């Protein structure tokens, strides 16, 4: 099947935002204007096309990122809808990995909110070019100029307005396009009847001021234009657009536009902005990977290159079973073909290929370079796996996911539900890499762990709804860790020689505190321990580190230097050295000033002025550390770091302290030492 749209006419982009900034509504409107939706879906009535899981429709938030294809003025747009709730950062992370550009939606009343910062940092990590759409311009308290300031201050980004609003709050009628220097006024409810006219007289000065600032910002990114600009020459519309596109793709400028998706104003202009300023697959660096020899290899976005694709999300569909959402980076992926899953080293057959439109699907013969779609029929593929041809194997860069910070015990209400629950949990863990499940060896309970209370609520909800497993749920538990404060040396000898073949392993190690991941250094000289036994010592230490000496929590942030030991010609074995390694680790830990660490959350609380003192007092009583305060639209914003263990049930406490008027958002920030008294309490409970 010949390619319908050339690569330069592709835009693969995501829509990212804080919860409630109007992201799903904005996506709905894009689908409406691009002709893929005949009736507009409203998040308020739970009728939105993008939010296709029942829990999303009930809660009015987007949980699963659905990739949708639509068309606009001769361009193919692939939109990835990403959740704005912090518990679902995994979805954002995985969608950013396969995007070329993004639109950040801000709420005109609030500007940059906590989750906006989180998502922005994630996008920085992948170097994703962005534009900003200031939504809800019709809402009371809307302030476009304040939004731009919050972007500059809190995100340290070079935000440049390319539109300014005409009126705001209930007087919002349209915008001035600063590039063309014309006013765009919306005449009807569906935003189809648009009048283009001169800039209103009362906005002329403001438009001139912002237009001059925009032209200067664009000229600064291009030497030729800068010379013209300094010589006082007029820059043409074409020159400005070309330079703005280049500066946006290079992350030098973040263009800012405005609108009200709910009122159908400004969405078409935003889609034009996506086409004009966000990159095509040819504008961004080609994807990198490693071949089987461990050498770096680059795959250009071209149908003629060997096929390589990344499975960025696994979902279970009630009608067709397992779907693997995939982006093809190079070559062509054909239905019915055999490919190699190079991450797992297994062959897979591509069953059917579908292009998703929110929750309906269109079957296709093939997916070409830069296309996104879902593969049905893959058996062994999980999130982050690479699919490629057997003739030219490659493993594309892996995705990294954070470890869970909260866990709960869960059990089925009936004996018969046990097996069903096991199958369901493993399916859910396949879909979501930040969700983990295991059996507690001591109690025999099934434990589920995730990124926050809402995350686990939704997992339990899905067990009941999709898999028909009724569960009892325990109280949430914090994922503590343990670490050490000082470097120590320790040794251990494991010797058993009583008739027959004995066991002998002996090692000396140094355990050193670090900031990073676990490291193992082999500093053995002169063959004190034979080379084949070194990995056994490492494995013994790794296993022992899963359960520390204070309260049995995993030990992190340390390095081991194995520097001496001894062996026995006959009695030494891998097993003996593994046991010696684990004994040496425990001996070292006992001397190394071990401490308990707890997850600390970054919390942002928004409250009316009159409740401020009460709420700050409450933050302090929760062992919170104040980071700062701002005021926004008559409300006070309190920023603080608070231990996760103190945040359980906070929503209810805040509601009662502020008569339902306070809101908060939190995300995991870092691990920190637990105070001595609490360490003893946690250890006491665990060691009962």
Curated annotation (Swiss-Prot):
One of its GO terms (molecular function) is GTPase activity. GTP binds at residues 17-24, 81-85, 135-138. It holds the Pfam family EF-G_D2. Residues 8-282 form the tr-type G domain. It comes from the Bacteria. It is found in: Cytoplasm. The keyword Protein biosynthesis applies. Keywords: Cytoplasm, Elongation factor, GTP-binding, Nucleotide-binding, Protein biosynthesis. GO terms for biological process: ribosome disassembly. SUPFAM superfamilies: EF-G C-terminal domain-like, P-loop containing nucleoside triphosphate hydrolases, Ribosomal protein S5 domain 2-like, Translation proteins. One of its GO terms (cellular component) is cytoplasm. Catalyzes the GTP-dependent ribosomal translocation step during translation elongation. During this step, the ribosome changes from the pre-translocational (PRE) to the post-translocational (POST) state as the newly formed A-site-bound peptidyl-tRNA and P-site-bound deacylated tRNA move to the P and E sites, respectively. Catalyzes the coordinated movement of the two tRNA molecules, the mRNA and conformational changes in the ribosome. Belongs to the TRAFAC class translation factor GTPase superfamily. Classic translation factor GTPase family. EF-G/EF-2 subfamily. This is Elongation factor G. It comes from Clostridium perfringens (strain ATCC 13124 / DSM 756 / JCM 1290 / NCIMB 6125 / NCTC 8237 / Type A). The lineage of its organism: Bacteria, Bacillati, Bacillota, Clostridia, Eubacteriales.
């Amino acid at each position: 099947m010949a390619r319908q749209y050339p690569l330069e006419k592709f835009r693969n982009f995501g829509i990212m935002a804080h919860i409630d900034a109007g992201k799903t509504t904005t996506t709905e409107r894009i689908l409406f204007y691009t002709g893929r939706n005949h009736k507009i879906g409203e998040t308020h009535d739970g009728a939105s096309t993008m939010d296709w899981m029942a829990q999303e429709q009930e809660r009015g938030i987007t949980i699963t990122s659905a990739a949708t294809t639509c068309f606009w003025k001769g361009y193919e747009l692939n939109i990835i809808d990403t959740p704005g709730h912090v518990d679902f950062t995994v979805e954002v992370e995985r969608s950013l990995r396969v995007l070329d550009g993004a639109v950040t939606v801000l709420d005109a009343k609030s500007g940059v909110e906590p989750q906006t910062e989180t998502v922005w940092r994630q996008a920085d990590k992948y170097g994703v070019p962005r534009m900003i759409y200031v939504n809800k311009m019709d809402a009371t308290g809307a302030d476009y100029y304040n939004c731009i300031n919050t972007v500059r201050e809190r995100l340290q980004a070079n935000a440049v307005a390319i539109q300014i609003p005409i009126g705001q709050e209930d007087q919002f009628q349209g915008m001035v396009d600063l590039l063309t220097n014309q006013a765009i006024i919306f005449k009807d409810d569906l935003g189809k009847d648009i009048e283009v006219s001169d800039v209103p007289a009362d906005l002329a000065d403001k438009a001139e001021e912002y237009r001059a600032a925009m032209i200067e910002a664009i000229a600064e990114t291009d030497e030729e234009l800068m010379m013209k600009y300094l010589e006082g020459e007029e820059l043409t519309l074409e020159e400005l657009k070309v330079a703005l596109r280049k500066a946006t793709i290079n992350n030098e400028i973040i263009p800012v536009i405005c609108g009200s998706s709910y009122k159908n104003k400004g969405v078409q202009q935003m889609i034009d902005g996506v086409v004009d300023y966000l990159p095509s697959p040819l504008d961004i660096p080609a994807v990198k990977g490693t071949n089987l020899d461990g050498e770096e290899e680059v795959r250009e976005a071209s149908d003629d290159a060997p096929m390589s694709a990344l499975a960025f999300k696994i979902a279970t569909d009630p009608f067709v079973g397992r779907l693997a959402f995939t982006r093809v980076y190079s070559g062509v992926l054909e239905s019915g073909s055999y490919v190699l899953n190079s991450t797992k080293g297994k062959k897979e057959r591509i069953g059917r290929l579908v292009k998703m439109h929110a929750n309906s699907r269109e079957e296709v013969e093939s997916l070409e370079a830069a296309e996104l779609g879902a593969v049905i029929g893959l058996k062994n593929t999980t999130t982050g796996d690479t699919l490629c041809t057997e003739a030219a194997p490659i493993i594309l860069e892996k995705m990294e996911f954070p470890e869970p910070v909260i866990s709960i015990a869960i059990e089925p209400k009936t004996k018969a539900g046990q097996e069903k629950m096991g199958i369901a949990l493993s399916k859910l863990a396949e879909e979501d890499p930040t969700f983990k499940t295991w059996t507690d060896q001591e109690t025999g309970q099934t434990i589920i762990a995730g990124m926050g209370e809402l995350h686990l609520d939704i997992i339990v909800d899905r067990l009941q709804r999709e898999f028909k497993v009724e569960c009892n749920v325990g109280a949430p538990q914090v994922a503590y860790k343990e670490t050490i404060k000082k470097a120590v040396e320790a040794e251990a000898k494991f010797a058993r020689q009583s008739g027959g073949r004995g066991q002998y392993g002996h090692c000396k190690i140094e355990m050193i505190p670090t900031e990073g991941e676990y490291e193992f250094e082999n500093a053995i000289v002169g063959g004190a321990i034979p080379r084949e036994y070194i990995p056994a010592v490492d494995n013994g230490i790794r296993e022992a580190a899963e359960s520390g000496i204070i309260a049995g929590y995993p030990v992190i942030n340390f390095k081991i230097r194995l520097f001496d030991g001894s062996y026995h010609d006959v009695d030494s074995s891998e097993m003996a050295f593994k046991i010696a390694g684990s004994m040496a680790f425990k001996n070292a830990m006992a001397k190394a000033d071990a401490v308990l660490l707890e997850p600390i959350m970054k919390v942002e609380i928004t409250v009316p002025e009159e409740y401020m003192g009460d709420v700050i007092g409450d933050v302090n009583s929760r062992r919170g550390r104040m980071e700062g305060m701002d005021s926004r639209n008559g409300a006070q914003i309190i920023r603080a770091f608070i231990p996760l263990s103190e945040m359980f049930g906070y929503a209810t406490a805040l509601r009662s302290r502020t008569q339902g008027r306070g809101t908060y958002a939190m995300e995991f920030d870092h691990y920190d030492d637990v105070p001595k008294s609490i360490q003893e309490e946690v250890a006491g409970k665990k060691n009962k």
